[in-house]
């Protein structure tokens, strides 16, 4: 007979909590961030910066993801990052934006002045 009853959910929560990063700044959709991503090419590794607007921040715990969009040579580029991945070195917030949605998918259809986001002064 077992002395302690531990269910699988408690074990999973404990394992996931040990793998979470603690140095992640607070940001939401509409904010402009830089994600420092580690790229492994053969035996070499390098850090690549991806700067853009957060379209969506989704999930919780170790499965939390963020979609970042930027314009590169007139072409929109979106990249999805797992926030707590060991390949993400760090995340920097450049400026905070004011939007009314959690998922700003309408930004995909906009360019130029209509793609501007009002800046929020957060300290």
UniProtKB/Swiss-Prot annotation:
Recorded GO CC terms: cytosolic large ribosomal subunit
Keyword Membrane among record annotations: no
Highest taxon of the lineage: Bacteria
One GO term (biological process): translation
Pfam family, one: Ribosomal_L19
GO MF annotation: an example: structural constituent of ribosome
Entry keywords, A to Z: Ribonucleoprotein, Ribosomal protein
Listed PROSITE patterns: RIBOSOMAL_L19
Gene3D superfamilies: 2.30.30.790
InterPro entries reported for this sequence: Ribosomal_bL19 (IPR001857), Ribosomal_bL19_CS (IPR018257), Ribosomal_bL19_sf (IPR038657), Translation_prot_SH3-like_sf (IPR008991)
Family in the record: Belongs to the bacterial ribosomal protein bL19 family.
Biological function: This protein is located at the 30S-50S ribosomal subunit interface and may play a role in the structure and function of the aminoacyl-tRNA binding site.
The protein, known as: Large ribosomal subunit protein bL19
Gene designation: rplS
